[in-house]
């Protein structure tokens, strides 16, 4: 099978590329370095020639709801239009658990992406995943004021990005199924505890302070409204196991 991966160098996308190659598929990585611009659509027609399935794990890190919505809807429509021209049979899109239950600009953008996929004319599968273990590291780096690391008090059920990438490939190998069962890690965690654990394991200096961030999004997360529902696919690697794995790699 010939599989194209948008966002194929990202947190999940590079794992999807690895998994697809390990399973014997021919992989096309849709990146600017390969002459493909997802936002303008440049290079997509040539890249998707002969492709059977497209996995979209593309992402934009932004706090602007407008920018996020423009990015996800534009990229999705460009992909779907090029897929129709190329005769692609299946579009697999990565989304997030709970985006319809927590009011947040980025989540609204992902919902808009889902609607574009549903209306796009290419048979589709959408996989909603929980936050990745790597999310704790992003917050550890990004939420720091005067040497103090701020850790939001929220509940999550994080999953290894590698397992999400593998699941995307499994779905790509099957028939389009609409909304696939959500995917989450094996254990619920407090995000503040995750950040403390990672800081200790990686030698990050400075105190970690748990805080209750304002806003309806964080209130919904504290209440557990963005946790997976019944029937979710449950991964294997816990956050603690992932941290130990990262520490082992660093020490080599």
Which residues does each predicted region cover?
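Conserved beta-loop-beta element that borders a ligand/cofactor-binding pocket
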Residues: 90, 95, 100, 112-135, ...
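N-terminal Rossmann NAD(P)H-binding glycine-rich loop of SDR-like oxidoreductase domains
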Residues: 1-25
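Glycine-rich Rossmann NAD(P)(H)-binding loop
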Residues: 150-155, 181-188
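Mobile cap/lid helix-loop segments that border enzyme active or cofactor-binding sites
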Residues: 188, 195-252
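NAD(P)H-binding glycine-rich loop region in Rossmannoid oxidoreductase-like domains
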Residues: 21-86, 96-101
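A conserved pocket-lining segment of Rossmann-fold NAD(P)-dependent short-chain dehydrogenase/reductase
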Residues: 125, 138-159, 163, 175
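Non-catalytic, hydrophobic alpha-helical segments
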Residues: 12, 54, 161-168, 183, ...
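Glycine/proline-rich active-site loop of Rossmann-fold NAD(P)-dependent oxidoreductases
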Residues: 134-146, 171-181, 204-206
């Amino acid at each position: 099978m010939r599989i194209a991966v948008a966002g194929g160098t990202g947190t999940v996308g590079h794992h999807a590329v690895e998994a697809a190659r390990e399973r014997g598929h021919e992989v096309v990585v849709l990146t600017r370095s390969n002459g493909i611009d997802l936002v303008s659509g440049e290079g997509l027609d040539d890249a998707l020639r002969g492709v059977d399935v497209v996995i979209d794990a593309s992402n934009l890190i932004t706090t602007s709801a407008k920018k996020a919505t423009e990015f996800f809807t534009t990229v999705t429509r460009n992909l779907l239009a090029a897929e129709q021209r190329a005769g692609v049979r299946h579009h697999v899109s990565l989304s997030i658990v709970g985006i319809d239950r927590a009011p947040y600009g980025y989540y609204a953008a992902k919902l808009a992406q889902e609607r574009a996929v549903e209306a796009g004319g290419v048979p589709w599968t959408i996989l909603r995943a929980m936050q990745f273990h790597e999310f704790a590291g992003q917050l550890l780096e990004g939420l720091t004021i005067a040497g103090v690391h701020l850790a939001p008090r929220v509940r999550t059920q994080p999953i290894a990005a590698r397992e999400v990438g593998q699941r995307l490939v499994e779905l790509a190998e099957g028939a389009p199924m609409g909304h696939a069962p959500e995917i989450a890690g094996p254990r619920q965690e407090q995000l503040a505890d995750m950040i403390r654990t990672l800081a200790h394991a990686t030698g990050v200096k400075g105190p970690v302070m748990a805080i209750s961030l304002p806003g309806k999004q964080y209130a919904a997360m504290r209440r557990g409204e963005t946790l997976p529902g019944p029937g979710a696919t449950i991964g294997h690697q816990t956050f603690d196991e992932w941290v130990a794995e990262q520490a082992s790699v660093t020490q080599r």
